[in-house]
UniProtKB/Swiss-Prot annotation:
Disulfide bonds: none
Membrane-spanning ranges: none
Gene Ontology terms, MF aspect: thiopurine S-methyltransferase activity
Uppermost EC category: transferase
Keywords assigned: Cytoplasm, Methyltransferase, S-adenosyl-L-methionine, Transferase
Family matches, as InterPro entries: SAM-dependent_MTases_sf, Thiopur_S-MeTfrase_Se/Te_detox, Thiopurine_S-MeTrfase, TPMT
Binding site for S-adenosyl-L-methionine: 10, 45, 66, 123
Name of the featured protein: Thiopurine S-methyltransferase
Length: 220
Protein backbone atom coordinates (compact mmCIF):
# COMPACT_ATOMS: atom_id res chain seq x y z
CA UNK A 1 0.00 0.00 0.00
CA UNK A 2 1.31 3.41 -0.94
CA UNK A 3 2.12 5.79 1.91
CA UNK A 4 -0.08 8.63 0.70
CA UNK A 5 -3.06 6.33 0.20
CA UNK A 6 -2.82 4.96 3.75
CA UNK A 7 -2.45 8.40 5.33
CA UNK A 8 -5.33 9.79 3.28
CA UNK A 9 -7.63 6.98 4.41
CA UNK A 10 -6.95 7.78 8.05
CA UNK A 11 -7.24 11.52 7.48
CA UNK A 12 -10.62 11.09 5.79
CA UNK A 13 -11.86 8.57 8.35
CA UNK A 14 -12.19 5.91 5.64
CA UNK A 15 -11.22 3.05 7.93
CA UNK A 16 -13.67 0.28 7.11
CA UNK A 17 -10.81 -2.14 7.77
CA UNK A 18 -10.86 -1.18 11.47
CA UNK A 19 -12.74 -3.63 13.67
CA UNK A 20 -14.62 -2.15 16.62
CA UNK A 21 -14.42 -5.41 18.57
CA UNK A 22 -11.56 -7.70 19.49
CA UNK A 23 -10.99 -10.24 16.72
CA UNK A 24 -12.54 -13.60 17.56
CA UNK A 25 -9.80 -15.57 15.84
CA UNK A 26 -7.21 -13.86 18.02
CA UNK A 27 -9.10 -14.86 21.15
CA UNK A 28 -9.65 -18.42 19.93
CA UNK A 29 -6.24 -19.26 18.49
CA UNK A 30 -3.65 -17.12 20.28
CA UNK A 31 -3.09 -19.75 22.96
CA UNK A 32 -1.89 -22.12 20.20
CA UNK A 33 1.34 -20.11 20.13
CA UNK A 34 2.23 -20.78 23.80
CA UNK A 35 3.79 -17.34 24.21
CA UNK A 36 4.90 -16.64 27.78
CA UNK A 37 3.15 -13.75 29.55
CA UNK A 38 5.34 -10.67 29.63
CA UNK A 39 6.79 -11.37 26.19
CA UNK A 40 7.00 -8.66 23.57
CA UNK A 41 4.53 -9.10 20.70
CA UNK A 42 4.98 -7.28 17.41
CA UNK A 43 1.82 -5.98 15.70
CA UNK A 44 2.73 -4.63 12.23
CA UNK A 45 0.58 -1.91 10.61
CA UNK A 46 -1.44 -1.88 13.81
CA UNK A 47 -3.71 1.13 13.28
CA UNK A 48 -5.73 1.66 16.45
CA UNK A 49 -6.65 -2.00 16.75
CA UNK A 50 -8.67 -3.20 19.74
CA UNK A 51 -6.63 -6.38 19.51
CA UNK A 52 -3.63 -4.60 21.02
CA UNK A 53 -5.59 -3.90 24.20
CA UNK A 54 -6.62 -7.54 24.39
CA UNK A 55 -2.99 -8.62 24.13
CA UNK A 56 -2.04 -6.10 26.83
CA UNK A 57 -4.79 -7.53 29.00
CA UNK A 58 -3.29 -11.00 28.61
CA UNK A 59 -0.03 -9.73 30.10
CA UNK A 60 1.98 -9.11 26.93
CA UNK A 61 3.98 -6.04 25.98
CA UNK A 62 2.69 -4.89 22.60
CA UNK A 63 5.10 -3.40 20.07
CA UNK A 64 2.99 -1.75 17.39
CA UNK A 65 4.18 -0.29 14.10
CA UNK A 66 1.98 2.24 12.32
CA UNK A 67 2.46 4.87 9.64
CA UNK A 68 -0.41 7.19 10.58
CA UNK A 69 -0.03 9.52 13.55
CA UNK A 70 -3.80 9.99 13.53
CA UNK A 71 -4.28 6.27 14.10
CA UNK A 72 -1.78 6.11 16.94
CA UNK A 73 -3.16 9.18 18.69
CA UNK A 74 -6.71 7.84 18.35
CA UNK A 75 -5.70 4.59 20.02
CA UNK A 76 -4.56 6.35 23.17
CA UNK A 77 -7.23 9.08 23.16
CA UNK A 78 -10.06 6.55 22.97
CA UNK A 79 -8.66 4.85 26.07
CA UNK A 80 -8.03 8.03 28.04
CA UNK A 81 -4.31 7.31 28.11
CA UNK A 82 -1.57 9.91 27.88
CA UNK A 83 1.44 8.17 26.35
CA UNK A 84 5.01 9.28 26.73
CA UNK A 85 6.17 10.47 23.31
CA UNK A 86 9.81 10.38 22.25
CA UNK A 87 11.72 10.62 18.98
CA UNK A 88 13.87 7.67 17.96
CA UNK A 89 15.59 8.36 14.65
CA UNK A 90 12.89 8.69 12.00
CA UNK A 91 10.21 7.36 14.34
CA UNK A 92 7.93 8.93 16.91
CA UNK A 93 7.40 6.43 19.72
CA UNK A 94 4.25 6.48 21.85
CA UNK A 95 4.62 4.48 25.06
CA UNK A 96 2.29 3.54 27.93
CA UNK A 97 2.20 0.58 30.32
CA UNK A 98 2.19 -2.60 28.28
CA UNK A 99 2.55 -0.95 24.89
CA UNK A 100 4.78 1.06 22.60
CA UNK A 101 3.79 2.11 19.09
CA UNK A 102 6.47 3.09 16.60
CA UNK A 103 4.99 5.67 14.25
CA UNK A 104 6.78 5.68 10.91
CA UNK A 105 7.75 3.41 8.03
CA UNK A 106 7.51 -0.25 9.08
CA UNK A 107 10.12 -1.18 6.49
CA UNK A 108 12.65 1.09 8.19
CA UNK A 109 12.34 -0.60 11.60
CA UNK A 110 15.25 -2.63 12.94
CA UNK A 111 15.75 -5.09 15.76
CA UNK A 112 17.82 -2.44 17.48
CA UNK A 113 14.69 -0.28 17.55
CA UNK A 114 12.11 -2.73 18.83
CA UNK A 115 14.17 -5.27 20.76
CA UNK A 116 13.42 -8.99 21.11
CA UNK A 117 9.84 -9.88 20.16
CA UNK A 118 8.84 -13.46 20.91
CA UNK A 119 5.79 -13.44 18.64
CA UNK A 120 3.84 -11.40 16.14
CA UNK A 121 0.17 -10.90 15.34
CA UNK A 122 -1.04 -9.92 11.86
CA UNK A 123 -4.73 -9.51 11.13
CA UNK A 124 -4.64 -6.61 8.68
CA UNK A 125 -1.03 -6.03 7.60
CA UNK A 126 -0.33 -8.61 4.92
CA UNK A 127 -3.77 -8.20 3.34
CA UNK A 128 -3.27 -4.42 3.23
CA UNK A 129 -0.32 -4.80 0.88
CA UNK A 130 -0.48 -5.36 -2.88
CA UNK A 131 1.27 -8.38 -4.35
CA UNK A 132 4.40 -6.45 -5.29
CA UNK A 133 4.99 -5.50 -1.64
CA UNK A 134 4.05 -8.71 0.16
CA UNK A 135 7.29 -10.62 -0.21
CA UNK A 136 9.19 -7.54 0.97
CA UNK A 137 6.90 -7.49 4.01
CA UNK A 138 7.68 -11.14 4.76
CA UNK A 139 11.43 -10.53 4.55
CA UNK A 140 11.17 -7.49 6.82
CA UNK A 141 9.19 -9.53 9.32
CA UNK A 142 11.90 -12.18 9.24
CA UNK A 143 14.57 -9.52 9.78
CA UNK A 144 12.76 -8.24 12.87
CA UNK A 145 11.83 -11.57 14.45
CA UNK A 146 14.30 -13.94 16.16
CA UNK A 147 14.74 -17.65 15.67
CA UNK A 148 12.30 -19.83 17.62
CA UNK A 149 9.51 -17.26 17.43
CA UNK A 150 5.89 -17.73 16.40
CA UNK A 151 3.04 -15.75 14.94
CA UNK A 152 -0.68 -15.69 14.29
CA UNK A 153 -1.58 -14.62 10.74
CA UNK A 154 -5.06 -13.98 9.35
CA UNK A 155 -5.53 -13.60 5.59
CA UNK A 156 -8.25 -13.47 2.95
CA UNK A 157 -8.42 -15.37 -0.32
CA UNK A 158 -10.82 -14.53 -3.13
CA UNK A 159 -11.02 -14.02 -6.91
CA UNK A 160 -9.17 -10.75 -7.34
CA UNK A 161 -10.11 -10.54 -11.02
CA UNK A 162 -13.58 -9.58 -9.76
CA UNK A 163 -12.58 -7.29 -6.91
CA UNK A 164 -9.54 -5.13 -6.34
CA UNK A 165 -8.14 -4.68 -2.86
CA UNK A 166 -7.46 -3.61 -0.28
CA UNK A 167 -7.93 -5.89 1.48
CA UNK A 168 -6.00 -7.99 -1.00
CA UNK A 169 -6.25 -11.71 -1.63
CA UNK A 170 -3.35 -13.78 -0.30
CA UNK A 171 -3.52 -17.23 -1.92
CA UNK A 172 -2.56 -20.18 0.27
CA UNK A 173 -0.22 -21.39 -2.48
CA UNK A 174 1.64 -18.07 -2.43
CA UNK A 175 1.98 -18.13 1.35
CA UNK A 176 3.36 -21.66 1.37
CA UNK A 177 5.82 -20.88 -1.42
CA UNK A 178 7.18 -17.69 0.15
CA UNK A 179 7.17 -18.65 3.82
CA UNK A 180 7.65 -22.41 4.04
CA UNK A 181 11.42 -22.16 3.66
CA UNK A 182 11.78 -20.34 6.99
CA UNK A 183 8.49 -21.06 8.74
CA UNK A 184 6.30 -24.01 9.57
CA UNK A 185 2.91 -22.87 8.28
CA UNK A 186 -0.16 -24.51 9.83
CA UNK A 187 -3.71 -23.54 8.99
CA UNK A 188 -5.73 -23.72 12.21
CA UNK A 189 -9.00 -22.10 11.23
CA UNK A 190 -11.00 -20.23 8.66
CA UNK A 191 -14.41 -19.50 7.24
CA UNK A 192 -16.21 -18.02 4.24
CA UNK A 193 -16.70 -14.33 5.11
CA UNK A 194 -18.45 -13.35 1.87
CA UNK A 195 -21.71 -12.29 3.47
CA UNK A 196 -19.95 -9.90 5.84
CA UNK A 197 -18.62 -7.90 2.87
CA UNK A 198 -21.23 -5.94 0.89
CA UNK A 199 -18.48 -4.87 -1.52
CA UNK A 200 -17.60 -8.49 -2.27
CA UNK A 201 -21.24 -9.45 -2.78
CA UNK A 202 -21.77 -6.51 -5.12
CA UNK A 203 -18.70 -7.55 -7.13
CA UNK A 204 -20.22 -10.98 -7.72
CA UNK A 205 -17.78 -13.03 -5.66
CA UNK A 206 -18.92 -16.53 -4.77
CA UNK A 207 -16.51 -16.91 -1.83
CA UNK A 208 -14.22 -14.82 0.33
CA UNK A 209 -12.29 -17.25 2.47
CA UNK A 210 -10.59 -16.20 5.67
CA UNK A 211 -7.57 -18.32 6.63
CA UNK A 212 -6.02 -18.41 10.10
CA UNK A 213 -2.43 -19.64 10.35
CA UNK A 214 -0.01 -20.40 13.14
CA UNK A 215 3.55 -19.76 12.00
CA UNK A 216 6.58 -21.24 13.75
CA UNK A 217 10.04 -19.96 12.81
CA UNK A 218 12.33 -22.81 11.84
CA UNK A 219 15.72 -22.76 13.56
CA UNK A 220 18.79 -22.64 11.35
Amino acid sequence: MKTDFWLQRWSAGQIGFHQSEVNQDLQQYWSSLSVAPGARVLVPLCGKSQDMSWLRGQGYHVVGAELSEAAVESYFTERGEQPQITSQGDFKVYAAPGIEIWCGDFFALTVRDIGHCAAFYDRAAMIALPADMRERYVRQLEALMPQACSGLLITLEYDQTLLEGPPFSVPRTWLQRVMSGNWEVTKVGGQDTLHSSPKALKAGLERMDEHVYVLERQSR
